[in-house]
Every structure is written in structure tokens, then in C-alpha cells.
Amino acid sequence: MKMKKILALLISGAMVLSLGACGDSAASGGGAAQEAAVEETAEAAEETTEAAEETTEAAEETTEAAEETAEAAEETAEATEETAEVAEETAEAAPAADNGGLNVCLASEPATLDPALNSSVDGATMLAHLFSGLAKWAQDENGNLEIVPDAAEELPEGVVGDDGKVTYTYKLRDGLKWSDGKDVTAQDYVFAWNRAASFDLAADYGYMFEVVDGYADIWDTEDGEEKDEEGNPIPVQKNPDAKLNVTAVDDKTIEVVLANPISYWNELLAFPTYFPVREDVVSNEAWATDPSTYVNNGPYTMTDWAHNSVITLTKNENFVDAAEVTMPVINFYLSDDANNMLTNFKNGDWLLIDDVPTNEMESLKQEYPDEFIVAGQIGTYYVCWNTNQALLPEGSDITDPAEVEKAQQEIRRAINLLYDRNYIVNDIGQAGQVPASSFVAMGMTDADGSQFYENAGDNEGFVGYYDVSNEALTDNFNEAMEILKKYYDFDEASQQFTNFPTLTYLYNTSEGHKMIGEYLQSALAAVGITMNLENQEWNTFLETRKNGDYSIARNGWLADYNDPICFLDMWTTASGNNDVQFGRGADATVKAYSLDLTDLGYDTKVEDGTWAETYDVLISDIKSCTDNETRYKLMHKAEDLLMSTGCICPLYFYTDPYMLDSSVKGFFANPLGYKYFMYTTIE
């Protein structure tokens, strides 16, 4: 989760993949409204049947048309049955909670509510209501977002030492309590940060502490005796006792040393991975799965978790700023069914929903002009390839591992040219998304204040790594075909490739993601490439993708803070978010990557090196660079290397569409996709 994954993953069905917007469906709503939905569905089914009969009569004119119509009628009937089933399930579901609280639905069951382990946007939103970090996101009197002190008395400037390291000293506020009444201490933060960064926990966002002195020692590894499935040695720590350079000077004073100055440190302090946890609480590995063992220090406590249904948060009277919390109860309903969400919103049962059916977008803009909201968001929706997926045809004469990878890089880049991104955003997304030609998202600034993405790719005539304009579709297609013909048999009569290996596209359950998958499938089928579609429930999907058990998968990333590095450091070999598997498995020893930094005053020049010898080194140089202009040039080189692999196929830059009932006042959201309800009222 980054302030990208929390700004991801990932947002959900309405084509905004916020990494935590999909998962198991949950029951909610109820009563006459759901019965009416069933009746409406039945009427729709009758109308569909009549339409099918009329179509059948028309189809008698030609056998071919009749067959096509029959297939369409079958699909319509199946869709009608599925809609009826959803409506029936909704009708039978438990009614919305009547506890005087605010009912909202962000996504399905979160994978975890442990701050160190969460990597989804919906989970981050809940954690922001449950924990208090040293800093937080807030609105000023003009409604502008800013980072302000939270558990810390103030956010002081760092002191730069002769060695270039930066020391920050924080004083905790008086009166800080855990939800069980015990005092919050500086040692709680020290423990939590070391736990999140630890080698043993291997948290997805552990690398968020890479800026802290000592992190490099924790992750300094050597080959161990055990081997993985590919026969490669499993890394072990050289220094098992290594810790972050953060200390509790006393119960209320925290001192932390950064390896070098960074501009986004305060934003990291507001990130959920930096939230405190207590050692005696988390010693129970299941602590974060049940309200009876869940101890936190934020505005709310968890009072109920009906798994796959609803999580109830109740105002924490031990919270130091409890007097400012205006909403006594928040009910987070759990669902990945956009139709179910919309039904409950229209019924008035849920006052905010973070996903809407794609096919309802245009009508909702007209019907709910003040409640259908499309907010800005710094993120990228993309397709990722598993770098270890074999793409060359059976019997290919290319066998050297490095040459195989170079060929597959070219193949992936070619396939990425076959997609019409304008069709995806205009006909499927319909929420103001912008076609993407680079990975670092629109909204990230460059060293001179311009947009980082506008300076990507170093191409004349267009921005980014390929031309996404409608005018370039034919040229892109022709270029892709010429490349693919180098590696595959092509039948001129059918204009299709005949020996491209079958692919499988993995996506998390959502109608929006499915529609995009179906479009990608059709674009490849047009040239003879078969790509099957496979959907999984959110938590299963995350695990499958993380483990590299896929060939191609849907993905998305939201900025974690306002610096392009949050889109780039996730792809280092050891990163918990390296779903592409760069530098892992078979790719660990493949020497197919090149890097030249001599034009920026560095000695680094690698021709045909491993991922660790090139990309990992480059990210390390970026993290230690103190010259701002050079640092940004290094980040452009990192994106160049990343995009040269073809493993990242950006489709569009995100927007954040959601529905908020006009009765809710005091709500705000940040650019990371987090939504804040603690200061709301219902009028």
C-alpha cells in the first residue's frame, strides 16, 4: 500500500482501481426497497423476453443473423438470471444498521487491518479512522488539504549532520491513550516501525522505511542454504539484529535519523504503515481479526466485525481529540457488487458508495448531478505481465536466457501497442479518465514544476512511451504486427498469428474490470492471440498476483505521496509490491538489462546486467541523491528502464468516481483515495 496504493491498487469496479476496492460481497439493505428491485428485475426480464422474440422473428431473414441473435439472447437471459439472483440476495439481506451511524460501502472484506500489512486503499481508509500517527491529513479552513501534527506536538525541521544524515525529534502530545486506556509511549512507535520494516514480517510496504537510517542494514542479505522452487538460494539477513535508527529518548520523545534529506517525510508520517501498534497486542498473530483483541489509538474503536458483511466503528472516548469527532458510529458495509451498492444508495441505506456500475455512469451524472462525484486522483490503471511467463512459440530457436528475455520485452511492448486506450476511457470508463502513455501518473510534478509524465519517453511528436492518440492507432497496429511477425507464424489469408501461446488475464471480481478484460481479449483475438479471462475474489487475487502465479493481470497504483519515486521503488527485487517478479525466480540471473548513468556524473554503466545490478542500483542512487535536478533525471531513467521491459502496460490515469448523499456534511477525501468520515454530520 503506498500513499499509491493508497492513493492502488488498486479503484474498484467503476474503473477506478484503488487497490482495495474489490473483494467478497456482503449483504445489506432490506425491506420493501429490495422487493421493489426484484419486481423491477422481473419486469425487465419480461421485456427482455419480448425483445428476444422480436429479434428471433427478424432473424428468420438469414441463418447467420439468427445464430448471432440466438447467442445474444442466451447471453441476455443469463445476465437477466444473474441480475435476478443479485436482487433476490439483496432482498433477503439484513437491513442497514440502526445505530445512529453513517452507513458507507468502500469495497469488500479487507485482507487485513494491521497497519503494517495493509496494502489497499479501503483498508487504509479504515485504518485512518482507527489509528493516530505522528502526522495526519486534514482540511484547512478553506477546504485545502494539508499534513498537520497528530500524535506529535509539532512537525519540526530536521537537523542535517556533517555526515549528511538528518535527525528529527518529536514530542508526543499529552493525554495519548490506547483504546484499552493504557498510555501511548514513544517506544510503541519505535517498536511498530521496526516491526513494519523487519525482514521477518516482509510487509508489502516495508520499503516505506527505506529512507530511515539502518534500513539498508536490515535488508543486507546473502545467499542462504535453502533454495526456492527454481533452485535459487533463498536470501538470509547478514545482520539479524539490525534495527532502524529510531529511538525512544523517553516515554514522550522520539528521535529518528534519515539516511539523507527527503521532501516527503511528513507525508510518510501520515501513511498507515507508520502508525503505532503495541508489542503485547500484536504478539497475538490474530489480533487484527476480531474486535475483542483489536487495540488502537485513533478516533474510533472497532466494536463489531461481521465478516464479509459489515465492520462497525464507534467513537473512541479515550482518543485525545474525541471532542472533535462528530460522527458517533461508522458502519463500513462490505461488498464488491456495484449494482448492490447502487441499489442501497438509491434506497437511502448507504450514504456513500465507492463504486458504481459502469453502464450506469452517464445516467447517474444526469440523475444525481450533485451526488455523483468524480474527484481527481494521482494513479495509473495498468496491465502487468509476469516477467517469467514464457511467450516465445514452442520450438523457437532462441534459447539463451538473456536473448529470450530481450525478445519477450519486444513482444510485450508490441502487444501493448494493440490497445485503443481512448475506447477504454470513453466507452468503458466514462468517468473522465485520461489515456496513459507512461506509468508515473498525471499529477506528479517534475523538478521544474512541470508534469513528470509530460517529460517521459523522450519522443518527438507525442508524450510518453507510445502515442495514444486516435490518429496513431493504425501506425501502432502496423508496428506491433511487424514486430510479432519476427517471432510467430502469420497466416496472410486470415491475417492472424497461428502459434502464439495461450494467455490468461487475471482480474479481481468487478464488472468494470471484466469489461476491460473482455476488450483486451477481443483486441488480441483479432490477430489470432487467445487470451482467457479468470476472475478471483479480491484477497485471493492479491495473493495470486503477489506470488507470481499468473501470466497477465489487471493492476493499479495510486500515489503514496507527492514524489515520482512512489511509482518506481515498488519494482525493486525485494519490494513487497513487485508483482511482476523482476529479479525473482528465473529472472534473478537473467542478464538482459542495461543502465548508463555516466551522463549524470556517475560511474555506473552496465551492459546486459541483472535486474539487481541495474534497476535496484538505480533506485538506491535515487534514494541517496541530494541534488534535486539530478535526482529527477535519475527517476526518468528508472521509468525508461521499467517501460523498456514491456511488463508494464499503462491504460489510463485514474479519476475517483463515487456517490455521496447530499445529507452528509463535513466529508473529505485526499489524493491517495482515502475518505474521511470522522468529522461528518447527517442533516
List the predicted regions and their residue ranges.
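N-terminal lobe/hinge region of extracytoplasmic solute-binding protein
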Residues: 105-163, 295
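A structural "hinge/loop" feature
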Residues: 106-128, 151, 204-205, 265-275, ...
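A bilobed periplasmic-binding-protein/Venus flytrap-type ligand-binding module shared by bacterial periplasmic
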Residues: 137, 314-319, 379-411, 418, ...
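Gly/Pro-rich hinge or "lid" segments in bacterial periplasmic/extracellular proteins
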Residues: 139-142, 222-233, 237-243, 247, ...
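Aromatic- and charge-enriched surface segment that lines or borders ligand/interaction sites
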Residues: 153-211, 255, 344, 401-407, ...
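Extracellular/periplasmic solute-recognition and catalytic clefts
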Residues: 303-314, 331-394, 422, 426-428, ...
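Append "and occasionally in soluble cytosolic enzymes with long acidic Gly/Pro-rich linkers
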Residues: 405-522, 526, 637
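Detector for C-terminal structural segments
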Residues: 416-455, 511-521, 544-683
